[in-house]
C-alpha cells in the first residue's frame, strides 16, 4: 500500500502493512545491511560476571542491552538517556527487546558454498554449471582443481584435475597459460562469470534442435533454473557465501540452570565451531602457512558452515556432548517441532482451563455447567475491572486480595460478568469443526464441567473420564463470533452430510422407542380421546397403558394458520411425543405415529428443522431429550441372561453344515475340486449357516408372545428393543451372544475354515477361544495405527484444500457433471435424489412427458424439487459442480450449492475446502485398516445366482446368447446387461451378466420378485465355444504344454495347461483348442469371419477330449478362480489414501485408448503383445504388453471400445483422465471413495470429495508452448494458462496448449502457489530452496499463509474485513491521485503565470 504517499498528509502513519512476501537469496551486501556488527570471538558470557563478552556471540555492543534502558557498565540508566551510546562499553541505551531483532555477521576468510543450493535436489549449483554434483563436491572439498580459463592449452573449460595432473599441466603449459582453481573460490569464479541471458538463448536453440528425449529433459531442467535466476534478479554467485548472518541472541538463548551450569541452544555450539575454524584460518593465512594446511582448514570451515545450516545433510552428523545430533537452522524449521508447525500454526492459548466432563441433562442446549472455581480463575481480569468500577477496590492488588479471599460480593460480580459471555468448549481430538462449540456458562458447584447430552455426538464425547478444555473469547468481536457462529444451537446439522447431529442417543432413544411401541390386548383398547388432558387422566388411573391401541384427536394448523383437528389410530405414548411437535402445516402427526427408532427420530428432527427453523428445533430437541430420559428411567428396561434366546434349530443347522463340509472334503479327495475350491465352498457354507442361525434367533427374539392367563401381550425382549431402536448394540452383537460367533479371520485377513459354533451365552471351548483371540489382537493393534494414519490423511487433505474458499456468487460456467443413481449389484445404493439435493441445476430440468420446467437452470434443487424429479422418473440430471467451477481463486457459491451445515445456499467466504477435508478425514478412524487378502476367500464368492429384486419386465441390452447342448441359454457376450423395468417403464435394477452364465429369462419376459434370472459357477471361469463342431487340439504336447496331473491327496487326474515357455523347445508353441467343422478335422469352423481357435492360458483345465462333438455355448475349458485369487482388495483407510494420492495400484487395469479390433502381436518371453487396430483410419495402432499368466478376456478379432478394460483390476486414475476425461475421472474417484465409506455406513456428501478432486486437478502439463514462453513439460495452473492464452490470442500470437494432469494430495499441496503454505506442510528445505532461487512471491491468498504471518484468515468474517480493506486501499489511491492532480495543476498554473509575466516583462 502506498504509505510513502500517505505520509505527506499524515506524519503519524501506522506501521507498514504488506500484501505479499517475497523470498530470495540474500546477497552479501544484504547480509551486511542487516548486521549490527561483526562477531569475532567464539566466547559467549564471562563465567564470573555472567556478562556477555565483547565481540562474542552474545555481545551487548552488537545486539543491544541486557536490561531495559541500561548500558552494560551501568553508567547510563533510565529512560532519559534513551538512544545514547555509552562511550565506555559501547552499548546503546534502549529496550532489551532489540536482542530479539538485531542480527550480527561473521566475515569468512574463505568463501563457502550454501549447502541448500548444493545438495537440495535438484542441486542448483551443479545444474547451473552443467556439472555433476560429485564433481562440484570434489572441487568444494579440495580434492580436485577445476579449470576456470583454458587459454590456448589443450585443457577443456570445467575440466577436473587431480593434484598430480595440475602439477603436470603447470610443467607442460606454464603457470600463466591457464587458470585452475580449487575450493569454493573456484565455484564462485565460475558462477560470477556466467552470462545468464546468453546461456538461456543457447539452451532454447539447442532445445528446438534436439530430438533425444533424455537430452530434452536435461536441457529443460537447466533452462528452468537459468530462467528462475533471470526472472528473480538473484545472482548465481550469491549461492556461495562470503559472510554468514548470525541470528539474534535471544532466539538462541543461554539459560542458567541451578547448580551453576548453563543450558544452551545447539546453534551456539554450531556458531562457535564456525568462528573457531574461521579465526584459525585467518591466522594461518597471516602466517603464510603451507597450502595443504590452509586448504584443510578451508575445508573444515565449509563443513562447519554446512553443519550450521543443515546438520547431517552431508558427511557425518555433528553431535553435542551427550551424543545427540545438534539442531541446525534447517531443523529449527522442519517437522512437527519446527518453527512452522509448533509456533506459527499452533499456539498455546491463555485464559483456558480443562476438567473432566459429566452429563448435564437439566441444561438447555446452549448452556454448559462451569465449575465456580474455574470461572473465577478464567474471568479474573473482568472481575478486577468490575470490582474497581463498583468501588470495592482501588488497585489491582486489592482486587486480587478480594478475589483470593472469595468475598461474597465477588460471587455476585462473577455472576454479572459471566452473564451473556459465551465460552468455547473443545474436546481433543478436534477432528471437525464441531469439536469446538460455544456455550453460555452456568455456574455450578463441584469441579467437573457439565455438558449437554445432545452435543455428545458432535464432540464424540462420553462420560467415562473424558476431559474437555474451556476457552474464554476476550474481545468483543470474538464474543460476537462465538455467539452468532459457534453457539451449539447453530450447529444442528452435520457439515459432512446435512443430517441432524443434535440427535438423541442411547437412553433417550430407548425411552422414546419404549413410548412409541404398540401392544395388543392392552387395557382400554379402542378408546377414543379428544384431548391430552383426558389422556393423562386415563394414564394416571391406569385405564390405559402407554402402548394401548386407541384413537386420539390431534390438533395442528393448516396453510392459512387456522386450527384443524384430525383423528388418528395411535397409542398414548405416541400422543405424548406428538404433543411436543411444533404446530406447522408441513409437519403431520404421522412422523411420530411409528416406532421411534434412532433413524426415525433423526428424520423427525430434520423435518422440524427444515419447516420450523432453528429456534423451534432447539426447543423441540431439549423437550424430546427430557421426555426420553424420563421414560427410559420409568420403563426400567434391563436384561438378564434369559433374554438371550438361543434358537432350537441351531443344532440342526450346524449338523447340516458339518455334513456339507464333509462332503466337500470328500469331493476334494475324489479330485473333483481343487484345494482352493474346497476352501471356498467350506467357508461359504459356514458363512450361510451362521446367517441362518442368526435369522432364526432374530425370529425368536422379535416374536410376539401372549400371556395365556391375562391374554395380554408379553413385554418385548429388552435386548431386541435396545438393538432395534438403535440405542445400543447391533444385530451382529446379538448374533454372537445368542446365535453362533461364526467364522474368524487370521491376522493376515484370511478366514479360518473352522468356525466358532458356540456363542457367548454357551461359552467358547478352549480351541474356539484361541481361534477368536488370533484375529482380535490384530484388531487392537490396528486401532492404534489407524488413529495416526487417519490424522495424517486429514492433515494432507486440509493442506491441499485450505485455499478453496467461496469467493464469488456465480462464475457463469456452462460446464457441469451428470448425476445418476449409483447402482451396485442391482441395488440402488444412492438414489438420484440424495445425490442432487442442494446442488444447482446446470440447465433446465424438464418433465420427460409434459415438458414443463421442474427446476430452472442455475437454481438450487430443494427437497420439493427432488420429489418432483423422482416422481417424473428422470434418471440423470446435469448439475453444477466445484470440479467444473471457473472461479479464479476459490469456488463460486452456485457451483458449490447448499451449505450442508445450515441448509441454506452457501455464504461467501465459507472455507469449503477445510470443511471438505474435515468431513472426509473425521470418519477416518471408523474405517478399517485391513487389506483383505482374498485367498479365494468367501468374499470372492459373492453369489452364484441372481434373483429379481423387483417385479417387472425384462429388457436385455447387447443380447448375445446361444442354446448349448443341454438346451440352456448361455451368455456369450462380455457386456450383456439385464434390466428390470416397472409398469411405468422406469429402470428399477440393472445387472451385468458374466460370460458363461446360464439365463432363465429372455427379452420381454415378465418376472416376479424373487424369481431366479441367471446362475453361474462362482469358482471357475469358463471358456465357451461359439460354434458347433468337433474338438481338435493344437500345440498340446504332453509334458511340454499339457500335463496330466494327479491331485496329491486324491490321485484323480486332470489335464492342465502348463507354462510351455519355461522349456526352450516350447518357445514357439501356441496351445489352443480348435473346433473343426467336420469329423475328419480338415477345415476349421469359421466364426465372425475368423477361425474358431481358442488360445489357452497357463493353469487352464481342459474339459473336452479331442474329437468330441460340441455345440455352441458348451464349456471346452475352465480356469479355476484361484488364479484370480491373490487379488488383494485394499479396503478402508489405505484405499482412500491410495485414491487421494492418485497412486497407480499394483496390478492395475489396462484401459483401451482407442476403439478398434484386437490383434495379437509377437509375444516376448513372459509378456503377451496385444495390438488394437483402430476403427478410425487416421489413428496409429496401439500396443500393450500383458504378463502372460494374467487372465485375458478377448479373442483375436474382438471389437473393443475406447475406455474398455483390456485387463481387469483397479484402473490407474491417470489413465482414466487421459483416456476418458475429467468427468469420468471425477465420477470414478467420487464413487470409489464413497464405496469405502458406504461400507462403514458413513454418509459423506459428494461435493466434499469433488472439492478435493478439484484441488488435485489444478495443474496442466504444457505440450505445445506456442508464444507463451513456457517450456514443454512445465506444470502450470489451469486458470493461469487460460488467462495467458486469452492475452496471446488477443495479440494475435500462438496460444500454448496442455493436458490436464492429476496430482496426488501430497504433491498438490507442495505445488501450491504459496511457498509459505508448502514449506509448513512437508519437505521444508526443498520448498524454501526452490522458492528462494525463483524469487517467489507469496500473495497470502490461502488460510495457512495468513495464520503464519499472524493475520485474520481470508475466510468468514476475516474475508469480509479483507474485502473492506481492499476497497479502502483502492479509494485511498484514488484520493491521493486526485490530490496529486490538483496540486500538479496548481503548480502548472503558477508556472504559467510566471512564464506569461516573464514574457510581458521582456
UniProtKB/Swiss-Prot annotation:
Could you tell me which Pfam families the record lists for this protein? Answer: RNA_pol_Rpb1_1, RNA_pol_Rpb1_2, RNA_pol_Rpb1_3, RNA_pol_Rpb1_4, RNA_pol_Rpb1_5
Q: Which residues bind Zn(2+) 2?
A: 811, 885, 892, 895
Query: Which InterPro entries does the annotation name?
Result: DNA-dir_RpoC_beta_prime, DNA-dir_RpoC_beta_prime_bact, RNA_pol_asu, RNA_pol_N, RNA_pol_Rpb1_1, RNA_pol_Rpb1_3, RNA_pol_Rpb1_3_sf, RNA_pol_Rpb1_4
Instruction: Please give the catalytic activity noted in the UniProt record.
Output: RNA(n) + a ribonucleoside 5'-triphosphate = RNA(n+1) + diphosphate
Q: What is its EC number?
A: 2.7.7.6
One cellular component (GO) term of this entry = DNA-directed RNA polymerase complex
What GO terms are given for molecular function? DNA binding; DNA-directed RNA polymerase activity; magnesium ion binding; zinc ion binding
* Keyword check for Metal-binding: yes
* Biological processes annotated in GO: DNA-templated transcription
Tell me yes or no: is Metal-binding among this UniProt entry's keywords: yes
Name the SMART domains on file: RPOLA_N
Keyword annotations from UniProtKB, A to Z? DNA-directed RNA polymerase, Magnesium, Metal-binding, Nucleotidyltransferase, Transcription, Transferase, Zinc
Q: Coiled coil where?
A: none
Write out the residues that bind Mg(2+).
462, 464, 466
Domain of life, per lineage: Bacteria
What is the enzyme's class at the highest EC level? transferase
Residues the record lists as binding Zn(2+) 1: 71, 73, 86, 89
* Cofactor comment: Binds 1 Mg(2+) ion per subunit. Binds 2 Zn(2+) ions per subunit.
CDD domains in the record: RNAP_beta'_C (cd02655), RNAP_beta'_N (cd01609)
Cofactors: Mg(2+); Zn(2+)
Q: Which SUPFAM superfamilies match?
A: beta and beta-prime subunits of DNA dependent RNA-polymerase (SSF64484)
Family in the record:
Belongs to the RNA polymerase beta' chain family.
Quaternary data: The RNAP catalytic core consists of 2 alpha, 1 beta, 1 beta' and 1 omega subunit. When a sigma factor is associated with the core the holoenzyme is formed, which can initiate transcription.
Function statement? DNA-dependent RNA polymerase catalyzes the transcription of DNA into RNA using the four ribonucleoside triphosphates as substrates.
Name assigned to this protein: DNA-directed RNA polymerase subunit beta'
Which species? Bartonella quintana (strain Toulouse)
Amino acid at each position: 500500500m502506498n504509505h510513502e504517499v500517505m505520509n505527506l498528509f499524515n506524519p503519524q502513519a501506522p506501521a507498514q502493512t504488506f500484501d505479499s512476501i517475497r523470498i530470495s537469496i540474500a546477497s552479501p551486501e544484504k547480509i551486511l545491511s542487516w548486521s549490527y556488527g561483526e562477531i569475532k570471538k567464539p566466547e559467549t558470557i564471562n563465567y564470573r560476571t555472567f556478562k556477555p563478552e565483547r565481540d562474542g556471540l552474545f555481545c551487548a555492543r552488537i545486539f543491544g542491552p541486557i536490561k531495559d534502558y541500561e548500558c552494560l557498565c551501568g553508567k547510563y540508566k533510565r529512560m532519559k538517556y534513551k538512544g545514547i551510546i555509552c562511550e565506555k562499553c559501547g552499548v546503546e541505551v534502549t529496550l532489551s527487546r532489540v536482542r530479539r531483532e538485531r542480527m550480527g555477521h561473521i566475515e569468512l576468510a574463505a568463501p563457502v558454498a550454501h549447502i541448500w543450493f548444493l545438495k537440495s535436489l535438484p542441486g542448483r549449483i551443479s545444474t547451473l554449471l552443467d556439472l555433476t554434483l560429485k564433481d562440484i563436491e570434489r572441487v568444494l572439498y579440495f580434492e580436485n582443481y577445476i579449470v576456470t580459463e583454458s587459454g590456448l592449452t589443450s585443457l577443456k573449460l570445467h575440466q577436473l584435475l587431480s593434484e598430480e595432473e595440475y602439477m603436470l599441466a603447470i610443467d607442460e603449459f606454464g603457470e600463466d597459460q591457464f587458470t585452475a582453481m580449487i575450493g569454493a573460490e573456484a565455484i564462485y569464479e565460475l558462477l560470477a562469470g556466467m552470462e545468464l541471458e546468453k546461456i538461456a538463448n543457447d539452451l532454447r536453440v539447442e532445445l528446438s534442435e534436439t530430438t533425444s528425449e533424455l537430452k530434452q529433459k536435461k536441457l529443460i531442467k537447466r533452462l528452468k533454473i537459468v530462467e528462475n535466476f533471470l526472472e528473480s534478479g538473484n545472482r548465481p554467485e550469491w549461492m556461495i557465501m562470503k559472510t554468514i548472518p548470525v541470528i539474534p541472541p535471544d532466539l538462541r538463548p543461554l539459560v542458567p540452570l541451578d547448580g551453576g551450569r548453563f543450558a544452551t541452544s545447539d546453534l551456539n555450539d554450531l556458531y562457535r565451531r564456525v568462528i573457531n575454524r574461521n579465526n584459525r584460518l585467518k591466522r594461518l593465512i597471516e602466517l603464510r602457512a603451507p597450502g595443504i594446511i590452509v586448504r584443510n582448514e578451508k575445508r573444515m570451515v565449509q563443513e562447519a558452515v554446512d553443519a550450521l545450516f543443515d546438520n547431517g545433510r552431508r558427511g557425518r552428523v555433528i553431535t553435542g556432548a551427550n551424543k545427540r545430533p545438534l539442531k541446525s537452522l534447517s531443523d529449527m524449521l522442519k517437522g512437527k517441532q519446527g518453527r512452522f508447525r509448533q509456533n506459527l500454526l499452533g499456539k498455546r492459548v491463555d485464559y483456558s482451563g480443562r476438567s473432566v466432563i459429566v452429563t448435564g441433562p437439566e441444561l438447555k442446549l446452549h448452556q454448559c455447567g462451569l465449575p465456580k472455581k474455574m470461572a473465577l480463575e478464567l474471568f479474573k481480569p473482568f472481575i478486577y475491572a468490575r470490582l474497581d468500577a463498583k468501588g470495592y477496590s482501588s488497585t489491582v492488588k486489592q482486587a486480587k486480595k478480594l478475589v483470593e479471599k472469595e468475598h461474597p460480593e465477588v460471587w455476585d460480580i462473577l455472576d454479572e460478568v459471566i452473564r451473556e459471555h459465551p465460552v468455547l468448549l473443545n474436546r481433543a481430538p478436534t477432528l471437525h469443526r464441531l469439536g469446538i462449540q460455544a456455550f453460555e456458562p452456568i455456574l455450578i458447584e463441584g469441579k467437573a464441567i457439565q455438558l449437554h447430552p445432545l452435543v455428545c455426538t458432535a464432540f464424540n464425547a462420553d462420560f467415562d473420564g473424558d476431559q474437555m478444555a474451556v476457552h474464554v473469547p476476550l474481545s468483543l468481536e470474538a464474543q460476537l463470533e462465538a455467539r452468532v457462529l459457534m453457539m451449539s444451537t447453530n450447529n444442528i446439522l452435520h457439515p459432512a452430510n446435512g443430517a441432524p447431529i443434535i440427535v438423541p442417543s442411547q437412553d433417550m432413544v430407548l425411552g422414546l422407542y419404549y413410548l412409541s411401541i404398540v401392544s395388543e390386548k392392552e387395557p382400554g383398547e379402542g378408546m377414543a380421546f379428544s384431548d391430552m388432558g383426558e389422556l393423562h387422566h386415563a394414564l394416571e388411573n391406569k385405564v390405559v397403558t402407554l402402548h394401548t391401541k386407541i384413537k386420539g384427536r390431534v390438533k395442528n394448523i393448516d396453510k392459512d394458520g387456522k386450527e384443524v383437528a384430525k383423528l388418528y389410530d395411535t397409542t398414548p405414548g405416541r400422543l405424548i411425543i406428538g404433543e411436543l411437535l411444533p404446530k406447522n402445516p408441513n409437519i403431520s402427526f404421522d412422523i411420530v405415529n411409528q416406532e421411534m427408532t434412532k433413524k426415525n427420530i433423526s428424520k423427525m428432527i430434520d423435518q422440524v428443522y427444515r419447516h420450523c427453523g432453528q429456534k423451534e428445533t432447539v426447543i423441540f430437541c431439549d423437550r424430546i431429550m427430557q421426555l426420553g430420559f424420563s421414560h427410559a428411567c420409568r420403563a426400567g428396561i434391563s436384561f438378564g441372561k434369559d433374554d438371550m434366546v438361543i434358537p432350537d434349530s441351531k443344532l440342526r443347522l450346524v449338523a447340516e453344515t458339518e455334513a456339507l463340509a464333509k462332503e466337500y472334503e470328500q469331493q476334494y479327495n475324489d479330485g473333483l475340486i481343487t484345494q482352493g475350491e474346497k476352501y471356498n465352498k467350506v467357508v461359504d457354507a459356514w458363512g450361510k449357516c451362521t446367517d441362518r442361525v442368526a435369522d432364526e434367533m432374530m425370529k425368536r427374539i422379535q416374536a410376539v408372545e401372549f400371556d395365556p392367563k391375562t391374554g395380554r401381550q408379553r413385554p418385548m425382549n429388552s435386548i431386541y428393543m435396545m438393538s432395534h431402536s438403535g440405542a445400543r448394540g447391533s444385530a451382529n452383537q446379538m448374533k454372537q451372544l445368542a446365535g453362533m460367533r461364526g467364522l474368524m479371520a487370521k491376522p493376515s485377513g484370511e478366514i479360518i475354515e473352522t468356525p466358532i459354533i458356540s456363542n457367548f451365552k454357551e461359552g467358547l471351548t478352549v480351541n474356539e477361544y484361541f481361534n477368536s483371540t488370533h484375529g482380535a489382537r490384530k484388531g487392537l493393534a490396528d486401532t492404534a495405527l489407524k488413529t495416526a494414519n487417519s490424522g495424517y490423511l486429514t492433515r494432507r487433505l486440509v493442506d491441499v484444500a485450505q485455499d478453496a474458499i467461496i469467493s464469488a456468487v456465480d462464475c457463469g460456467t456452462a460446464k457441469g457433471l451428470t448425476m445418476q443413481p449409483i447402482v451396485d449389484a442391482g441395488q440402488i445404493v444412492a438414489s438420484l435424489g440424495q445425490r442432487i439435493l442442494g446442488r444447482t441445476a446446470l440447465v433446465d430440468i424438464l418433465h420427460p412427458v409434459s415438458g414443463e420446467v421442474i427446476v430452472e437452470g442455475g437454481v438450487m434443487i430443494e427437497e420439493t424439487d427432488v420429489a418432483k424429479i423422482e416422481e417424473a422418473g428422470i434418471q440423470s440430471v446435469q448439475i453444477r459442480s466445484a470440479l467444473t467451477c471457473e472461479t479464479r481463486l476459490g469456488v463460486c457459491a452456485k457451483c458449490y450449492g447448499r451449505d450442508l451445515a445450515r441448509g441454506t445456499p452457501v455464504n461467501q467466504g465459507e472455507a469449503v475446502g477445510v470443511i471438505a477435508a474435515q468431513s472426509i478425514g473425521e470418519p477416518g478412524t471408523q474405517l478399517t485398516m485391513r487389506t483383505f487378502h482374498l485367498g479365494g476367500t468367501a468374499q470372492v464368492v459373492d453369489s452364484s445366482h441372481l434373483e429379481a429384486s423387483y417385479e417387472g419386465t425384462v429388457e436385455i441390452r447387447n443380447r448375445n446368447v446361444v442354446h448349448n447342448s443341454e438346451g440352456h441359454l448361455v451368455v456369450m457376450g462380455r457386456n450383456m446387461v439385464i434390466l428390470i423395468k416397472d409398469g411405468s417403464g422406469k429402470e428399477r435394477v440393472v445387472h451385468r451378466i458374466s460370460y458363461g452364465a446360464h439365463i432363465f429369462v429372455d427379452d420381454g419376459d415378465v418376472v416376479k420378485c424373487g424369481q431366479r434370472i441367471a446362475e453361474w459357477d462362482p469358482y471357475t471361469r469358463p471358456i465357451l465355444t461359439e460354434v458347433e463342431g468337433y474338438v481338435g487340439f493344437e500345440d498340446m504336447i504332453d509334458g511340454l504344454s499339457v500335463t496330466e496331473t494327479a491331485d496329491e491327496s486324491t490321485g484323480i487326474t486332470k489335464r492342465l495347461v502348463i507354462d510351455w515357455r519355461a522349456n526352450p523347445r516350447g518357445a514357439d508353441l501356441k496351445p489352443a483348442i480348435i473346433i473343426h467343422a467336420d469329423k475328419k478335422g480338415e477345415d476349421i469352423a469359421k466364426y465372425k469371419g475368423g477361425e474358431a481357435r481358442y488360445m489357452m492360458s497357463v493353469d487352464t483345465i481342459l474339459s473336452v477330449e479331442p474329437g468330441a462333438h460340441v455345440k455352441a455355448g458348451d464349456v471346452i475349458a475352465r480356469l479355476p478362480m484361484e488364479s484370480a485369487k491373490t487379488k488383494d482388495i485394499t479396503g478402508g483407510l489405505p484405499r482412500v489414501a491410495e485414491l487421494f494420492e492418485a497412486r497407480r495400484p499394483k496390478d492395475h487395469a489396462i484401459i483401451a485408448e482407442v476403439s478398434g479390433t484386437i490383434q495379437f502381436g509377437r509375444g516376448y518371453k513372459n509378456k503377451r503383445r496385444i495390438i488394437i487396430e483402430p476403427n478410425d483410419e487416421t489413428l496409429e495402432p496401439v500396443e500393450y504388453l500383458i504378463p502372460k499368466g494374467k487372465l485375458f478376456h478377448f479373442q483375436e478379432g474382438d471389437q473393443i471400445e475406447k475406455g474398455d478394460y483390456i485387463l481387469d483390476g483397479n484402473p490407474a486414475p491417470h489413465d482414466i483422465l487421459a483416456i476418458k476425461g475429467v468427468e469420468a475421472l471425477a465420477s470414478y474417484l467420487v464413487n470409489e471413495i464413497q464405496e469405502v465409506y458406504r461400507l462403514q455406513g458413513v454418509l459423506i456428501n459428494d461435493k466434499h470429495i469433488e472439492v478435493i478432486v478439484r484441488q488435485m486437478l489444478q495443474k496442466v502439463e504444457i505440450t505445445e508452448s506456442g508464444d507463451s514462453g513456457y517450456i514443454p513439460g512445465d506444470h502450470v495452473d489451469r486458470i493461469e494458462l487460460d488467462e495467458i492464452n486469452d492475452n496471446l490470442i488477443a495479440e494475435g500470437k500462438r496460444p500454448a496448449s496442455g493436458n490436464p494432469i492429476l496430482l496426488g494430495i501430497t504433491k498438490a499441496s507442495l505445488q501450491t502457489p504459496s511457498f509459505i503454505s508448502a514449506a509448513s506442510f512437508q519437505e521444508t528445505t526443498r520448498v524454501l530452496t526452490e522458492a528462494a532461487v525463483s524469487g517467489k512471491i507469496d500473495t497470502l491468498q490461502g488460510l495457512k499463509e495468513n495464520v503464519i504471518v499472524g493475520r485474520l484468515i481470508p475466510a468468514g468474517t476475516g474475508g469480509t474485513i479483507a474485502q473492506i480493506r481492499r476497497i479502502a486501499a483502492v479509494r485511498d489511491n484514488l484520493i491521493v491521485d486526485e490530490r496529486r492532480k490538483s496540486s500538479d495543476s496548481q503548480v502548472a498554473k503558477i508556472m504559467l503565470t510566471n512564464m506569461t509575466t516573464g514574457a510581458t516583462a521582456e
